[in-house]
């Protein structure tokens, strides 16, 4: 690491943080030297025509080269690059860097043969199979821009993304497999194309043995057949500021936003993160138990581990029921995983089905050094459960689709800091996190406000929203000039630790008091009978809003629901005060969630308020909403 700024009595973290804060160009120039450029950047930071900071604008490189070819050139071609483990099909497969490079080069050739070139968009609608990662890397190889959509997403949502991205081709598979259910993808893709005003020229279909798709001879291509005839394609040089991908994230209103990621800043930031945040050596085994359709899958299944020369794991399964709550621990044991990264909801599911950690005891986790969590607030009961059962450090960190890597975390490769439950620790070097009030003034420690990032944002953060720069300006930059507004509320404590209390929308107003539902969830979720919970603000004529709790019990727990409600009401009252007006907690079998594990609080609130609502496209199981309606009718 660097020791660039400040006196000798400063910690390693403080030195690194201040170097990045005070001399961002010098700091990021040093980090950029850790990747293999075709032409090294002479300019480190420059504003574009919209006044947005762009990193390494004259650097020339290729992300697929960094992830694959570079390691082969360095004599690491026989090292394991990717392990595919699929409990839903019983398949397991390992790819070396050379094998992965050769297959990606041929898929790039297969795309090129259909006219796909630099700057073209390609929609990737795939299950969690190796070909999904290969498709992404093949696009990167050509300088084409991939837009990955969760496999199985509803046709109308896929259609909206097709219309916005205007892809030349779509890459899909015949089906996905959810636990034991086969979901044919082809009818969903056909319907999306039919509904979209934009028509892609070709659709590549990867035929899986579990289900064969019928092809439309005019438009569809058999992936395996095209691959067998394809010639390998070399890496196309691109500018650091050329887009690598578009990833759609749900907007609070209207159509989804296409977050644009550039090539150079992304590669530099991810390479830095693997050592600074995750402390993984080259050749280490990194497992992000996520999906390639989500930003964590983009950054930490596909790009960062491969750029860093690690082994990455692509897991086609779930934390539970594939076949049991020991799935995560089996994978960690079998492949000697160094670091595991998933969302708190995955561990809550494991805890619910195996509260005593019986399955975990069957596996050897001696190789596992750290467990990282992100994607939603890590509630202290989940943190404590995972820590006590695994005896491993559990590290919460906070970031967004928009940034592509962590904004705040425990930088284990620079300096491991003491963990504070409920906090994602401190800002990562490169980010300046400030808490602002409604007027844009910084607030005192321990005071809640808008979590904002002072510009310039570090490399990898979005420079715009795809074909809608106004939306980028109004959604993120215009509220407080000179800052990027994250949309989250939270506070910094007296030690500079960041506490994210949830989306600004999750702050409720009870009789003029602004209260965080996240804080209430922390208290409710701390009850020994409860596996997970959600608190939403519902309309009240007298007080404006009142909090309402929904709780899921741990498996096997039997309680008197009224008595439990009384205990929870008492708990919130004693810890927040009567001002919270927390009076009701309803027991449900499960909470409605997105496929990436976020609880759909807004939809729950709309149902509770009797409002019209649309079923979110990102929902994992729409029938979970009926459950909420049912308990509210009681």
Predicted region positions:
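Conserved pre-ATP/AMP-binding loop-to-beta segment of ANL
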Residues: 78-80, 203-206, 211, 215-248, ...
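AMP-binding/adenylate-forming catalytic core of the ANL superfamily
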Residues: 149-174, 189, 333, 340, ...
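Conserved AMP-binding/adenylation subdomain of ANL enzymes
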Residues: 267-285, 295-339, 352-358
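AMP-binding/adenylate-forming catalytic domain of the ANL superfamily
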Residues: 201-207, 542, 574-599, 611-634
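Conserved ATP/PPi-binding loop(s) of AMP-dependent carboxylate-activating enzymes
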Residues: 426-430, 441-476, 515, 612-613
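Conserved AMP-binding/adenylate-forming core of the ANL superfamily
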Residues: 64, 82-137, 154, 158-159, ...
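Gly/Ser/Thr-rich phosphate-binding loop
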Residues: 310, 338-342, 351-418, 432, ...
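Structural core segment of the AMP-binding/adenylate-forming
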Residues: 137, 141-225, 344
């Amino acid at each position: 690491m660097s020791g660039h700024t400040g006196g000798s009595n400063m910690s390693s973290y403080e030195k690194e943080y201040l170097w990045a804060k005070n001399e961002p160009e010098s700091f990021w120039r040093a980090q950029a030297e850790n990747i293999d450029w075709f032409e090294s950047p002479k300019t480190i930071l420059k504003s574009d025509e919209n006044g947005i900071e762009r990193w390494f604008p004259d650097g020339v490189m290729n992300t697929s080269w960094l992830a694959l070819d570079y390691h082969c050139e360095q004599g690491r071609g026989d090292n394991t690059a990717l392990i595919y483990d699929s409990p839903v099909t019983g398949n397991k497969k390992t790819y070396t860097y050379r094998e992965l490079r050769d297959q990606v080069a041929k898929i790039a050739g297969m795309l090129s043969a259909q006219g796909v070139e630099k700057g073209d968009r390609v929609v990737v609608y795939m299950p969690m199979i190796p070909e999904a990662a290969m498709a992404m890397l093949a696009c990167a190889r050509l300088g084409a821009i991939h837009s990955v959509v969760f496999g199985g997403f509803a046709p109308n949502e896929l259609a909206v993304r097709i219309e916005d991205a205007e892809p030349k081709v779509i890459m899909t598979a015949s089906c996905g497999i959810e636990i034991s259910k086969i979901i044919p993808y082809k009818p969903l893709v056909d319907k999306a194309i039919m509904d979209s005003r934009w028509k892609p020229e070709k659709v590549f279909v990867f035929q899986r043995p579990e289900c064969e798709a019928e092809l439309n001879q005019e438009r569809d291509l058999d992936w395996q057949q095209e691959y067998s005839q394809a010639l390998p394609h070399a890496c196309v040089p691109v500018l650091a500021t050329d887009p690598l991908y578009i990833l759609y994230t749900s907007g609070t209103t209207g159509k989804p936003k296409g977050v644009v990621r550039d090539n150079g800043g992304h590669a530099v930031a991810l390479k830095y993160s693997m050592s600074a945040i995750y402390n993984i050596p080259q050749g280490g085994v990194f497992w992000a138990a996520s999906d390639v359709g989500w930003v964590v899958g983009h950054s930490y299944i596909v790009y960062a581990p491969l750029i860093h020369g690690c082994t990455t794991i692509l897991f086609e399964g779930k934390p539970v029921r594939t076949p049991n709550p020991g799935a995560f621990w089996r994978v960690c044991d079998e492949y000697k995983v160094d670091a595991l990264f998933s969302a708190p909801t995955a561990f809550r599911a494991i805890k619910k089905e195996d509260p005593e950690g019986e399955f975990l005891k069957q596996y050897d986790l001696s190789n596992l050094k750290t467990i990282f969590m992100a994607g939603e607030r890590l509630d202290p009961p989940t943190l404590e459960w995972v820590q006590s059962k695994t005896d491993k450090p559990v590290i919460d960190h906070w970031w967004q689709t928009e940034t592509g890597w962590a904004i705040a975390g425990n930088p284990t490769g620079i300096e491991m800091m003491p963990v504070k439950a409920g906090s994602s620790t401190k800002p990562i070097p490169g980010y300046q996190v400030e808490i602002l009030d409604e007027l844009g003034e910084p607030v005192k420690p321990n005071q809640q406000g808008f979590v904002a990032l002072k510009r310039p944002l570090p490399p990898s953060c979005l420079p715009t929203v795809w074909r809608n720069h106004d939306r980028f300006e109004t959604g993120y930059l215009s509220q407080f000039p000179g800052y990027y507004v994250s949309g989250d509320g939270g506070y910094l404590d007296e030690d500079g630790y960041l506490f994210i209390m949830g989306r600004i929308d999750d702050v409720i107003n009870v009789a003029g008091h602004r209260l965080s539902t996240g804080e209430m969830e922390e208290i409710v979720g701390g009850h020994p009978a409860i596996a997970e919970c959600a608190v939403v603000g519902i309309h009240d004529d007298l007080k404006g809003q009142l909090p309402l709790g929904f709780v899921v019990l741990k498996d096997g727990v039997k309680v008197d629901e009224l008595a439990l409600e009384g205990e929870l009401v008492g708990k919130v009252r004693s810890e927040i005060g009567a001002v919270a007006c927390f009076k009701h907690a309803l027991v449900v079998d499960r909470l409605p969630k997105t496929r990436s594990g976020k609880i759909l609080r807004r939809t729950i609130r709309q149902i509770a308020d009797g409002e019209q609502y649309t079923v979110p496209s990102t929902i994992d199981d729409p029938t979970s909403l009926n459950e909420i309606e049912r308990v509210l009718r009681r």
